[in-house]
A protein has these predicted regions:
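Long extracytoplasmic/lumenal interhelical loops at the membrane interface
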Residues: 248-264, 268-313
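Aromatic-anchored transmembrane helix interface
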Residues: 54-63, 75-98, 110, 117
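Transmembrane alpha-helices of multi-pass inner-membrane enzymes
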Residues: 33-36, 343-355, 361-409, 421
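Alpha-helical transmembrane segments of multi-pass inner-membrane proteins
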Residues: 105-134, 146-212, 327, 331
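A conserved mid-to-late transmembrane alpha helix and its immediate loop/hinge
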Residues: 184, 191-195, 264, 297-332, ...
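N-terminal signal-anchor transmembrane segment
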Residues: 1-43, 61-73, 352-354, 420
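Flexible juxtamembrane loops connecting transmembrane helices in multi-pass membrane enzymes
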Residues: 137-141, 145, 218-223, 233-265, ...
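Hydrophobic transmembrane alpha-helices and their immediate junctions
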Residues: 45, 170-173, 206-208, 212, ...
Length: 421
Protein backbone atom coordinates (compact mmCIF):
# COMPACT_ATOMS: atom_id res chain seq x y z
CA UNK A 1 0.00 0.00 0.00
CA UNK A 2 2.86 2.37 0.85
CA UNK A 3 4.43 1.83 -2.58
CA UNK A 4 1.12 2.49 -4.34
CA UNK A 5 0.60 5.75 -2.43
CA UNK A 6 4.19 6.76 -3.17
CA UNK A 7 3.67 6.25 -6.91
CA UNK A 8 0.39 8.21 -6.70
CA UNK A 9 2.30 11.05 -5.04
CA UNK A 10 4.98 11.01 -7.74
CA UNK A 11 2.26 11.03 -10.41
CA UNK A 12 0.64 14.06 -8.76
CA UNK A 13 3.97 15.89 -8.89
CA UNK A 14 4.30 15.01 -12.60
CA UNK A 15 0.92 16.34 -13.81
CA UNK A 16 0.42 20.13 -14.13
CA UNK A 17 -3.24 20.00 -13.12
CA UNK A 18 -2.26 18.47 -9.77
CA UNK A 19 0.83 20.49 -8.81
CA UNK A 20 0.99 23.81 -10.71
CA UNK A 21 -0.72 27.01 -9.67
CA UNK A 22 -2.44 27.91 -6.40
CA UNK A 23 -5.95 26.64 -7.07
CA UNK A 24 -7.91 24.99 -4.22
CA UNK A 25 -7.44 21.64 -6.00
CA UNK A 26 -3.63 21.97 -6.05
CA UNK A 27 -3.46 23.17 -2.43
CA UNK A 28 -5.71 20.30 -1.26
CA UNK A 29 -3.50 17.74 -3.06
CA UNK A 30 -0.38 19.35 -1.57
CA UNK A 31 -1.81 19.16 1.95
CA UNK A 32 -2.76 15.49 1.53
CA UNK A 33 0.72 14.59 0.27
CA UNK A 34 2.35 16.64 3.04
CA UNK A 35 0.25 14.80 5.62
CA UNK A 36 1.24 11.44 4.11
CA UNK A 37 4.94 12.40 4.12
CA UNK A 38 4.71 13.66 7.71
CA UNK A 39 3.07 10.44 8.93
CA UNK A 40 5.71 8.34 7.16
CA UNK A 41 8.63 10.43 8.46
CA UNK A 42 7.38 10.72 12.06
CA UNK A 43 8.54 7.23 13.16
CA UNK A 44 11.92 7.71 11.45
CA UNK A 45 13.02 11.13 12.68
CA UNK A 46 16.52 9.91 13.51
CA UNK A 47 17.38 8.88 9.90
CA UNK A 48 15.79 12.12 8.67
CA UNK A 49 17.93 14.28 10.98
CA UNK A 50 21.02 12.27 9.99
CA UNK A 51 20.21 12.79 6.30
CA UNK A 52 19.78 16.55 6.73
CA UNK A 53 23.00 16.75 8.77
CA UNK A 54 24.94 14.81 6.11
CA UNK A 55 23.76 17.24 3.42
CA UNK A 56 24.26 20.68 5.02
CA UNK A 57 24.33 22.68 1.78
CA UNK A 58 21.11 21.11 0.50
CA UNK A 59 19.46 21.61 3.90
CA UNK A 60 20.49 25.28 4.01
CA UNK A 61 19.32 25.78 0.41
CA UNK A 62 15.85 24.37 1.17
CA UNK A 63 15.57 26.52 4.30
CA UNK A 64 16.72 29.57 2.33
CA UNK A 65 14.14 28.99 -0.44
CA UNK A 66 11.37 28.61 2.15
CA UNK A 67 12.53 31.76 3.97
CA UNK A 68 12.50 33.78 0.73
CA UNK A 69 8.76 34.30 1.24
CA UNK A 70 9.76 36.92 3.83
CA UNK A 71 10.95 39.31 1.10
CA UNK A 72 8.68 38.09 -1.72
CA UNK A 73 6.92 40.83 -3.67
CA UNK A 74 3.61 39.05 -4.17
CA UNK A 75 0.65 39.02 -1.80
CA UNK A 76 1.63 37.35 1.50
CA UNK A 77 -1.00 34.59 1.37
CA UNK A 78 0.05 33.55 -2.14
CA UNK A 79 3.69 33.61 -1.07
CA UNK A 80 2.97 31.34 1.91
CA UNK A 81 1.04 28.93 -0.32
CA UNK A 82 4.00 28.78 -2.70
CA UNK A 83 6.25 27.90 0.24
CA UNK A 84 3.71 25.28 1.37
CA UNK A 85 4.00 23.60 -2.04
CA UNK A 86 7.81 23.75 -1.90
CA UNK A 87 7.85 22.24 1.59
CA UNK A 88 5.45 19.52 0.39
CA UNK A 89 7.54 18.22 -2.49
CA UNK A 90 10.82 18.68 -0.61
CA UNK A 91 9.42 16.69 2.32
CA UNK A 92 8.20 14.02 -0.08
CA UNK A 93 11.72 13.79 -1.52
CA UNK A 94 13.12 13.36 2.00
CA UNK A 95 10.54 10.64 2.65
CA UNK A 96 11.73 8.80 -0.48
CA UNK A 97 15.42 8.84 0.44
CA UNK A 98 14.84 7.77 4.06
CA UNK A 99 12.46 4.89 3.24
CA UNK A 100 13.90 3.49 0.01
CA UNK A 101 17.31 2.45 -1.25
CA UNK A 102 18.78 4.07 -4.35
CA UNK A 103 17.54 1.13 -6.39
CA UNK A 104 14.09 1.50 -4.85
CA UNK A 105 13.92 5.24 -5.57
CA UNK A 106 14.97 4.81 -9.21
CA UNK A 107 12.53 1.93 -9.65
CA UNK A 108 9.64 4.06 -8.33
CA UNK A 109 10.60 6.92 -10.65
CA UNK A 110 10.74 4.60 -13.67
CA UNK A 111 7.34 3.09 -12.78
CA UNK A 112 5.87 6.60 -12.47
CA UNK A 113 7.32 7.71 -15.82
CA UNK A 114 6.06 4.53 -17.49
CA UNK A 115 2.52 5.09 -16.20
CA UNK A 116 2.70 8.70 -17.39
CA UNK A 117 3.72 7.66 -20.90
CA UNK A 118 0.71 5.33 -21.12
CA UNK A 119 -1.62 8.03 -19.76
CA UNK A 120 -0.25 10.55 -22.29
CA UNK A 121 -0.92 8.19 -25.18
CA UNK A 122 -4.42 7.38 -23.90
CA UNK A 123 -5.19 11.10 -23.58
CA UNK A 124 -4.16 11.71 -27.19
CA UNK A 125 -6.26 8.79 -28.44
CA UNK A 126 -9.33 9.35 -26.26
CA UNK A 127 -9.40 13.13 -25.77
CA UNK A 128 -7.45 14.67 -28.69
CA UNK A 129 -9.03 18.11 -28.19
CA UNK A 130 -7.44 18.18 -24.73
CA UNK A 131 -4.16 16.37 -25.42
CA UNK A 132 -3.17 17.96 -28.74
CA UNK A 133 -2.19 21.62 -29.10
CA UNK A 134 -4.77 23.74 -30.90
CA UNK A 135 -4.93 27.41 -31.79
CA UNK A 136 -2.10 29.31 -33.44
CA UNK A 137 0.92 28.11 -31.45
CA UNK A 138 2.19 24.49 -31.75
CA UNK A 139 -0.92 23.45 -33.66
CA UNK A 140 -1.24 19.68 -34.00
CA UNK A 141 1.65 18.83 -31.67
CA UNK A 142 1.04 16.38 -28.85
CA UNK A 143 1.05 17.53 -25.21
CA UNK A 144 -0.83 14.66 -23.54
CA UNK A 145 -1.78 15.30 -19.92
CA UNK A 146 1.50 17.20 -19.47
CA UNK A 147 0.01 20.53 -20.54
CA UNK A 148 2.72 21.48 -23.06
CA UNK A 149 4.74 19.76 -25.77
CA UNK A 150 8.07 20.57 -24.08
CA UNK A 151 6.92 19.07 -20.78
CA UNK A 152 5.72 15.95 -22.58
CA UNK A 153 9.10 15.83 -24.31
CA UNK A 154 11.11 15.96 -21.08
CA UNK A 155 9.05 13.29 -19.31
CA UNK A 156 9.14 11.04 -22.38
CA UNK A 157 12.90 11.56 -22.59
CA UNK A 158 13.42 10.34 -19.02
CA UNK A 159 11.20 7.31 -19.59
CA UNK A 160 12.95 6.52 -22.90
CA UNK A 161 16.50 6.55 -21.52
CA UNK A 162 15.56 4.61 -18.37
CA UNK A 163 14.01 1.78 -20.39
CA UNK A 164 17.02 1.75 -22.75
CA UNK A 165 19.24 1.16 -19.71
CA UNK A 166 16.91 -1.48 -18.26
CA UNK A 167 16.86 -3.23 -21.67
CA UNK A 168 20.64 -3.68 -21.50
CA UNK A 169 20.25 -5.11 -18.00
CA UNK A 170 18.78 -8.14 -19.71
CA UNK A 171 15.42 -8.77 -17.98
CA UNK A 172 11.92 -8.27 -19.44
CA UNK A 173 13.39 -7.04 -22.72
CA UNK A 174 10.05 -7.10 -24.57
CA UNK A 175 8.49 -4.79 -21.96
CA UNK A 176 11.38 -2.33 -22.18
CA UNK A 177 11.34 -2.35 -26.00
CA UNK A 178 7.62 -1.53 -25.87
CA UNK A 179 8.19 1.49 -23.62
CA UNK A 180 11.19 2.63 -25.69
CA UNK A 181 9.02 2.61 -28.84
CA UNK A 182 6.09 4.29 -27.06
CA UNK A 183 8.24 7.13 -25.76
CA UNK A 184 10.03 7.46 -29.10
CA UNK A 185 6.58 8.04 -30.62
CA UNK A 186 5.72 10.65 -27.97
CA UNK A 187 9.06 12.43 -28.54
CA UNK A 188 8.51 12.55 -32.30
CA UNK A 189 4.90 13.73 -32.07
CA UNK A 190 5.57 16.48 -29.51
CA UNK A 191 8.50 17.77 -31.63
CA UNK A 192 10.38 19.22 -28.68
CA UNK A 193 13.75 20.01 -30.27
CA UNK A 194 15.53 20.31 -26.92
CA UNK A 195 14.19 16.94 -25.77
CA UNK A 196 15.16 15.24 -29.04
CA UNK A 197 18.71 16.63 -28.85
CA UNK A 198 19.08 15.66 -25.20
CA UNK A 199 17.68 12.19 -25.90
CA UNK A 200 20.30 11.65 -28.60
CA UNK A 201 23.09 12.98 -26.36
CA UNK A 202 22.09 10.91 -23.33
CA UNK A 203 21.61 7.80 -25.49
CA UNK A 204 25.21 8.20 -26.72
CA UNK A 205 26.35 8.68 -23.11
CA UNK A 206 24.62 5.43 -22.10
CA UNK A 207 26.31 3.53 -24.95
CA UNK A 208 29.67 5.10 -24.02
CA UNK A 209 29.43 3.97 -20.38
CA UNK A 210 28.20 0.45 -21.23
CA UNK A 211 30.94 -0.05 -23.84
CA UNK A 212 33.59 1.40 -21.53
CA UNK A 213 32.59 -1.03 -18.77
CA UNK A 214 33.03 -3.98 -21.15
CA UNK A 215 36.59 -3.02 -22.11
CA UNK A 216 39.14 -4.70 -19.83
CA UNK A 217 42.40 -3.49 -21.36
CA UNK A 218 43.74 -0.23 -19.87
CA UNK A 219 45.29 0.81 -23.20
CA UNK A 220 42.03 0.15 -25.08
CA UNK A 221 40.12 2.17 -22.48
CA UNK A 222 42.50 5.07 -23.00
CA UNK A 223 42.08 4.86 -26.77
CA UNK A 224 38.29 4.66 -26.40
CA UNK A 225 38.15 7.75 -24.15
CA UNK A 226 40.48 9.82 -26.35
CA UNK A 227 38.56 8.85 -29.52
CA UNK A 228 35.23 9.72 -27.89
CA UNK A 229 36.55 13.10 -26.68
CA UNK A 230 37.85 13.84 -30.18
CA UNK A 231 34.44 13.05 -31.72
CA UNK A 232 32.68 15.28 -29.18
CA UNK A 233 35.14 18.10 -29.87
CA UNK A 234 34.63 17.78 -33.63
CA UNK A 235 30.86 17.83 -33.08
CA UNK A 236 31.10 21.04 -31.04
CA UNK A 237 33.31 22.71 -33.67
CA UNK A 238 30.89 21.63 -36.42
CA UNK A 239 27.89 22.95 -34.46
CA UNK A 240 29.54 26.34 -33.89
CA UNK A 241 30.69 26.58 -37.51
CA UNK A 242 27.40 25.63 -39.13
CA UNK A 243 24.94 26.44 -36.33
CA UNK A 244 22.76 28.76 -38.42
CA UNK A 245 22.50 26.29 -41.30
CA UNK A 246 21.70 23.37 -38.99
CA UNK A 247 19.07 25.37 -37.09
CA UNK A 248 17.39 26.56 -40.30
CA UNK A 249 17.06 22.95 -41.49
CA UNK A 250 14.83 22.30 -38.47
CA UNK A 251 12.97 25.59 -38.80
CA UNK A 252 14.84 27.08 -35.83
CA UNK A 253 17.24 29.97 -35.28
CA UNK A 254 20.35 30.39 -33.15
CA UNK A 255 18.29 32.58 -30.80
CA UNK A 256 16.97 29.23 -29.44
CA UNK A 257 13.38 30.05 -30.43
CA UNK A 258 13.59 33.51 -28.90
CA UNK A 259 15.23 32.39 -25.65
CA UNK A 260 18.29 34.63 -26.01
CA UNK A 261 15.98 37.62 -26.51
CA UNK A 262 14.02 36.67 -23.38
CA UNK A 263 17.27 36.42 -21.41
CA UNK A 264 18.17 39.93 -22.51
CA UNK A 265 14.74 41.13 -21.42
CA UNK A 266 15.00 39.74 -17.87
CA UNK A 267 18.45 41.26 -17.21
CA UNK A 268 16.83 44.21 -15.42
CA UNK A 269 14.78 41.92 -13.17
CA UNK A 270 17.95 40.07 -12.16
CA UNK A 271 19.96 43.26 -11.55
CA UNK A 272 17.26 44.83 -9.37
CA UNK A 273 17.36 41.90 -6.88
CA UNK A 274 20.85 40.63 -7.61
CA UNK A 275 21.88 38.79 -4.43
CA UNK A 276 18.68 37.44 -2.86
CA UNK A 277 16.12 37.49 -5.66
CA UNK A 278 12.45 38.46 -5.73
CA UNK A 279 11.40 35.57 -3.47
CA UNK A 280 10.40 32.06 -4.50
CA UNK A 281 7.77 32.19 -7.27
CA UNK A 282 7.12 35.89 -6.72
CA UNK A 283 8.35 37.43 -9.98
CA UNK A 284 6.59 35.14 -12.46
CA UNK A 285 3.40 34.98 -10.37
CA UNK A 286 2.71 38.58 -11.43
CA UNK A 287 2.82 37.54 -15.12
CA UNK A 288 5.22 40.32 -16.19
CA UNK A 289 5.64 41.35 -19.82
CA UNK A 290 9.23 41.08 -21.04
CA UNK A 291 10.45 43.40 -23.81
CA UNK A 292 13.54 42.69 -25.92
CA UNK A 293 14.46 44.03 -29.37
CA UNK A 294 11.01 45.58 -29.70
CA UNK A 295 9.26 42.25 -29.04
CA UNK A 296 6.86 41.67 -26.16
CA UNK A 297 6.92 38.31 -24.36
CA UNK A 298 4.16 37.28 -21.93
CA UNK A 299 5.72 34.42 -20.00
CA UNK A 300 5.60 32.29 -16.87
CA UNK A 301 9.35 31.50 -16.91
CA UNK A 302 12.60 32.64 -18.51
CA UNK A 303 13.10 29.27 -20.27
CA UNK A 304 16.27 28.79 -18.23
CA UNK A 305 16.23 27.08 -14.86
CA UNK A 306 19.45 28.73 -13.71
CA UNK A 307 18.17 32.23 -14.60
CA UNK A 308 14.87 31.51 -12.87
CA UNK A 309 16.81 30.53 -9.75
CA UNK A 310 18.65 33.85 -9.99
CA UNK A 311 15.35 35.73 -10.30
CA UNK A 312 13.69 33.80 -7.45
CA UNK A 313 16.46 33.37 -4.88
CA UNK A 314 19.26 35.55 -6.22
CA UNK A 315 22.88 34.84 -7.01
CA UNK A 316 23.29 33.35 -3.53
CA UNK A 317 20.73 30.60 -4.13
CA UNK A 318 21.81 29.98 -7.72
CA UNK A 319 25.47 29.51 -6.75
CA UNK A 320 24.45 27.14 -3.94
CA UNK A 321 22.44 25.06 -6.43
CA UNK A 322 25.29 25.01 -8.97
CA UNK A 323 27.74 23.98 -6.22
CA UNK A 324 25.42 21.14 -5.22
CA UNK A 325 25.11 19.99 -8.83
CA UNK A 326 28.87 20.12 -9.51
CA UNK A 327 29.89 18.33 -6.29
CA UNK A 328 27.28 15.63 -6.95
CA UNK A 329 28.57 15.09 -10.49
CA UNK A 330 32.15 14.78 -9.20
CA UNK A 331 31.07 12.25 -6.55
CA UNK A 332 29.22 10.02 -9.04
CA UNK A 333 30.70 6.53 -9.38
CA UNK A 334 29.17 3.95 -11.73
CA UNK A 335 30.75 0.72 -10.49
CA UNK A 336 29.86 -2.93 -10.94
CA UNK A 337 27.51 -2.91 -7.95
CA UNK A 338 24.03 -1.78 -9.09
CA UNK A 339 25.60 -0.41 -12.28
CA UNK A 340 22.29 0.03 -14.12
CA UNK A 341 20.67 1.79 -11.16
CA UNK A 342 23.51 4.29 -10.85
CA UNK A 343 23.71 4.76 -14.62
CA UNK A 344 20.00 5.66 -14.63
CA UNK A 345 20.58 8.07 -11.74
CA UNK A 346 23.52 9.66 -13.59
CA UNK A 347 21.46 10.11 -16.77
CA UNK A 348 18.56 11.63 -14.81
CA UNK A 349 20.91 14.05 -13.06
CA UNK A 350 22.69 15.02 -16.29
CA UNK A 351 19.28 15.73 -17.80
CA UNK A 352 18.34 18.02 -14.88
CA UNK A 353 21.58 19.99 -15.24
CA UNK A 354 21.63 20.22 -19.06
CA UNK A 355 17.92 20.86 -19.57
CA UNK A 356 17.98 23.81 -17.18
CA UNK A 357 20.34 25.67 -19.49
CA UNK A 358 17.59 26.27 -22.09
CA UNK A 359 14.47 25.34 -20.12
CA UNK A 360 13.16 25.87 -16.60
CA UNK A 361 13.07 22.56 -14.72
CA UNK A 362 14.21 23.33 -11.19
CA UNK A 363 11.48 25.06 -9.19
CA UNK A 364 9.40 26.89 -11.78
CA UNK A 365 7.92 23.74 -13.33
CA UNK A 366 6.65 20.30 -12.32
CA UNK A 367 7.74 19.30 -8.82
CA UNK A 368 9.03 15.91 -10.04
CA UNK A 369 12.23 17.53 -11.35
CA UNK A 370 13.14 19.00 -7.96
CA UNK A 371 12.34 15.67 -6.28
CA UNK A 372 14.70 13.86 -8.70
CA UNK A 373 17.38 16.46 -7.96
CA UNK A 374 17.02 16.13 -4.18
CA UNK A 375 16.89 12.31 -4.21
CA UNK A 376 20.01 11.93 -6.35
CA UNK A 377 22.02 14.57 -4.43
CA UNK A 378 21.30 12.79 -1.14
CA UNK A 379 21.84 9.26 -2.46
CA UNK A 380 25.15 10.16 -4.11
CA UNK A 381 26.35 11.79 -0.87
CA UNK A 382 25.21 8.72 1.08
CA UNK A 383 27.17 6.40 -1.21
CA UNK A 384 30.21 8.68 -1.16
CA UNK A 385 30.20 8.68 2.64
CA UNK A 386 29.97 4.86 2.71
CA UNK A 387 32.83 4.55 0.21
CA UNK A 388 35.04 6.88 2.26
CA UNK A 389 34.20 4.96 5.46
CA UNK A 390 35.00 1.62 3.80
CA UNK A 391 38.34 2.97 2.56
CA UNK A 392 39.19 4.23 6.05
CA UNK A 393 38.34 0.84 7.57
CA UNK A 394 40.41 -0.97 4.92
CA UNK A 395 43.33 1.40 5.47
CA UNK A 396 43.08 0.94 9.26
CA UNK A 397 43.06 -2.85 8.91
CA UNK A 398 46.04 -2.76 6.56
CA UNK A 399 47.90 -0.40 8.89
CA UNK A 400 47.12 -2.60 11.91
CA UNK A 401 48.24 -5.69 10.00
CA UNK A 402 51.54 -4.04 9.00
CA UNK A 403 52.10 -2.82 12.58
CA UNK A 404 51.42 -6.29 13.99
CA UNK A 405 53.76 -7.93 11.50
CA UNK A 406 56.50 -5.39 12.27
CA UNK A 407 56.05 -5.98 16.02
CA UNK A 408 56.28 -9.75 15.56
CA UNK A 409 59.46 -9.43 13.51
CA UNK A 410 61.02 -7.17 16.14
CA UNK A 411 60.06 -9.61 18.89
CA UNK A 412 61.60 -12.54 17.00
CA UNK A 413 64.85 -10.63 16.53
CA UNK A 414 65.05 -9.91 20.27
CA UNK A 415 64.54 -13.54 21.30
CA UNK A 416 67.78 -15.04 22.82
CA UNK A 417 69.40 -17.65 20.65
CA UNK A 418 71.20 -20.56 22.38
CA UNK A 419 73.92 -22.52 20.60
CA UNK A 420 73.04 -26.05 19.66
CA UNK A 421 74.55 -28.67 22.07
Amino acid sequence: MKTVLTVVGLLAFSIPYACQGLSPRVIAISLLILLFSYLMLLPSLKPLIATLADNPLLTLLMMYIAASCLWAEQEQTSSMLMVLKFVTFSTFGLYLVTHYTTQGCIRLLVITLSILSVLNLLAVVLVPSFAIHGGVEHTGLWKGISGHKNTLGTLSLLCFVSHVIYFFRGTRKALHVGFVLLNALLLIKCQSTTSLLLTSSLFMFILFILLFKRIRSVSLRGFFISSSCLLVLLGIVFAFSYGDAIASEFGKTTTLTGRTEIWQGIAGAIDSHYWFGHGYGSFWANRPSIYANGIRFDLTSSHSGFRDLWIDIGLTGMLATITLAMTTLFKFRIGKTDMYTWLTAAVFFLFIVLNNITDSRFLNSLAIYWIIFVVIVIKVQERHRQTVAEKEITTSIQHASITLETTNRTARKKEPRFPAP
